Amino acid sequence: MNSRPLLLIGAIALSACTSDKAPSSEAVPAPVEPSTPATAQASPWEQAKARGLVFRGIGNEPGWLVEVGAGETPALHAELDYGERKIDVAHALPLTGATGYSGTTGDGVEVKLQLLREECSDGMSDQAYPVSAKLGVGDQTYAGCGRFLQE
């Protein structure tokens, strides 16, 4: 008996069971989540705290915000009139006999931030804050609310 036909049939059958593609030794990678900084999803209050600020305040009509850095003579940054005007005090001084800061901008404008620990509502969102804030910039006064961030 000739075994060649049997070997030929076995080889054909075996080749039918294999794929044209060689098996991949690489695993299919898991989907990659978009890389976004944690602060992109955080609230403005959490972002300010993460930047090391000690106070953040906001107000309406016109819209404004103020942020105060850490230290004995912290930087004070404010965005006024819905962000149309920005001011910076490089080294604000603590108020004597009150909670707050005062200083002068680089172009000579007097700035005073007075803070009072009392419940405050911004009037627009009905969000309650633990601090009322009054920001004086030159002869203009802005009223609003805020919170100390590092307590």
Predicted segments, located by residue:
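Sec-dependent bacterial lipoprotein signal peptides
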Residues: M1-S15
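Short, low-complexity, Pro/Ser/Thr/Gly-rich segments in the mature regions of secreted, periplasmic
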Residues: Y142-Q150
